[in-house]
């Protein structure tokens, strides 16, 4: 593509307040959330339409962005916009309870589902990488993964350190849109964190948004901070400027032993997401365009070195976990047979939550007023009496998390709670307690909406890790149930060929019609997660299905 239709220095921010720019709130909501994804306070590289996760985009080109906006502004309440890999391709007559937008991003026939084929199509302008919430317009900034990371660290602390992470520290890499959650999540869990990041702008972004506490230029400087904080029992974090592929092995050689090791570099994308050892940032940026194959080769070799060091920590008795960026797979493909020695975070720490349909429920205030979020926080507390763990999370979130773009909240709840919260929020809008409607969605990383054998569905009890019928059924059911927009993606989190996943978002606009849709969608969506795990034979899921009287004929009999 000549003259790069993906580059445009313009500032996009979602409208605020209760004035419509589209014809209905069900079309205003996707309009605002699309724009919010590209807010400079939200997106990692908004001028290139990149929201997070390497090259995870909100729209294919700026012309496509403009066409999507124009379509949403005129879309009828009985029409549905179809978006194919970030390009608006059709508007069709449906009905009022149908989704207003249906999105398919980055999907390839399995035999051709490789980065090589994707990059070929991407260069021709035929596709874009949607990541998970980038191309589905429900990214809320780094907050979106904070609680999941917090839950992981807390459970790891319970399993390995008797539930107390005071005086402990976590080593990780990556401070991008997802990895940037790690330092704050660690601090919330009571630990210190040393996060290695090669891009100084990313460290500065996390400092500005209060996700990391300090910045260090050298390993010695960072370790001095870690030693001082852990000795004092303080929970603080530092972003170390450098290359994880160089520094993690060096730390092991020096005899430095963290209390936990993980990684959240963008290793899922070996061309755009991972700086090779010995390369400068300038060299990397130039060669990604001039010689992408050389970049990929060097990055993959560097990832092997990185994983070898992580396995060395694991073998030395340090709890080590893969945080879902597919770095182990790359290392194995590069000849390191023991790359999967340490577990992924889902089977190690999170799966019992998924068995009950508990996952990253989130909502955003279309008014733009933080008070609307604080009021909904209070409503969540009111409707979940006795859930002290959740209440503690809400307290910490209000104190520590800075809103990026439209105010939003992440809150891990499951089947039986999501629909109650959605109905309560809708009633608050109806009564005028909130200044404008709210949108309710989730990450694609949820209990019933993803097939990802190296991440969410790793080591399933029945061996069904790679079965991707489940996210397809989830998307179909959410469409039939009346979600406001539904998305079906490929390759999020772990890269091309390694995942399929679905998303949904629904608007609470205070109307009775919205209430009916909310009750259906926010019950059915988490119920698919319980169904999926019950089918795999997990007793927790089977008990949850029975408790909620789910009708699962081929599973419960």
Swiss-Prot record:
It catalyses: 4-imidazolone-5-propanoate = trans-urocanate + H2O. GO terms for biological process: L-histidine catabolic process to glutamate and formamide; L-histidine catabolic process to glutamate and formate. Its main location: cytoplasm. It is an enzyme of class 4 (lyase). Binds 1 NAD(+) per subunit. The active site is at 411. NAD(+) binds at residues 53-54, 131, 177-179, 197, 243-244, 264-268, 274-275, 323, 493. One of its GO terms (molecular function) is urocanate hydratase activity. It is found in: Cytoplasm. Its EC number is 4.2.1.49. GO terms for cellular component: cytoplasm. Its cofactor is NAD(+). Keywords: Cytoplasm, Histidine metabolism, Lyase, NAD. Pathway: Amino-acid degradation; L-histidine degradation into L-glutamate; N-formimidoyl-L-glutamate from L-histidine: step 2/3. Belongs to the urocanase family. Catalyzes the conversion of urocanate to 4-imidazolone-5-propionate. NCBIfam families: hutU (TIGR01228), PRK05414.1 (NF003820). This is Urocanate hydratase. It comes from Mesorhizobium japonicum (strain LMG 29417 / CECT 9101 / MAFF 303099).
